[in-house]
């Protein structure tokens, strides 16, 4: 959706995933600021699940806008998918409201073990930065290889890439990769039904993925 569509105002609320899923595309801070300015009368929630892989966080805008909530998960760049831990940033008027309803939204509250693990992950800055940098490097290397194979690869600021090939249907590639034990995401939706979303793994995993794709492309 074009950013201009989110700047019309008159909404009951605005939710923005930045970076977006499944494309991986990021919105720059000046565009997020425009969205906030255009929707002063409602809450703007920015979901930054993938922000640490190459996008700019809106967290620094929280002191300026009392209608902004920024949510982060520790499941991605902090490597804690199993603990289901996250947090929200906002001014007191919004965080107080979240505290009132949090147990109504999720009956399984964050337990002591998850809180301890989450706090430790937030303190370990060196591991976090090294992991995020490694994912980005592997992502760009994989994207370059896929472009050599003829794929369109959207610029990504997430831990996945969104790809399409002019001569191979995405659904056919999905099936071929599945037969080789390689799982990717395909979306049966208008406008994106000829694209695959490929999560970034280790260098070895991405080499295996590229080799499997190349083999499929050589088949008539």
Which residues are covered by each model-predicted region?
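Active-site phosphate-binding strand-loop segment of PLP-dependent enzymes
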Residues: 1-52
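Short acidic/glycine-enriched loop/turn segments that link adjacent beta-strands
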Residues: 82, 157, 191-194
